[in-house]
A protein has these predicted regions:
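Post-transcriptional modification and biogenesis factors for structured RNAs
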Residues: 1-187
């Protein structure tokens, strides 16, 4: 199955879509995105990162967000500023620990895939992202906690051939969500 494509341009070439066309396209994408997607944030402390992740989660149709550890709360002004109101589109639950959050995700029928540069991790493009998944991301400086890595079903990393060792957590979340959705659309 391939994702819906935007309507074609005219003789003048491509053009930006009108709002009604964007809404129609979004409805089609939701229809073909059968797999459930959720996120678990383990001590993501910077409010602007949390807000960016929430906005991306809403854009990719994530249905749930588990916040744990020292993750900035959705009520923080910095989160609200970056999320631009999208926090109302994603259900959120605060859990005491990443292990409790991972167990809640598993109980909801989600495979927990931690996104981390760790020994034994598989490249994201080889990770089992088919079906219902919860992508777990960790702290900006320390990544996912050892406790979270121990309970995750899979640990995956984003291959980065450049000279930088890691991505910003909000960027990594968006890359992982895009790959999960791409996988759902191409099976």
């Amino acid at each position: 199955m391939t994702p819906p494509v935007p309507p074609g341009g005219d003789a003048a070439g491509p053009r930006q879509l009108r709002p009604v066309e964007v809404k129609r396209l979004n409805r089609e994408w939701r229809r073909v995105s059968g797999a459930r997607l959720a996120l678990l944030l383990d001590s993501v402390g910077q409010p602007f990162n949390v807000g960016s992740i929430v906005r991306s989660a809403a854009a990719f149709g994530a249905e749930h967000l588990w916040l744990c550890g020292g993750t900035a709360p959705l009520s923080h002004p910095g989160v609200a500023k970056t999320a631009l109101g999208t926090q109302r589109l994603v259900q959120a639950t605060v859990e005491a620990s990443p292990v409790a959050a991972a167990k809640a995700a598993a109980a909801a029928g989600l495979r927990v895939v931690a996104i981390e540069l760790a020994s034994g991790a598989v490249p994201l493009h080889e990770a089992p992202l088919d079906g219902d998944v919860c992508l777990a991301l960790g702290n900006e400086d320390h990544g996912c906690s050892a406790a979270l890595l121990a309970v995750a079903d899979v640990v995956a990393y984003i291959p980065q051939p450049g000279r930088v060792g890691s991505l910003n957590v909000a960027v990594a979340a968006a890359v992982a969500m895009a790959e999960a959705r791409r996988r759902a659309w191409t099976r």
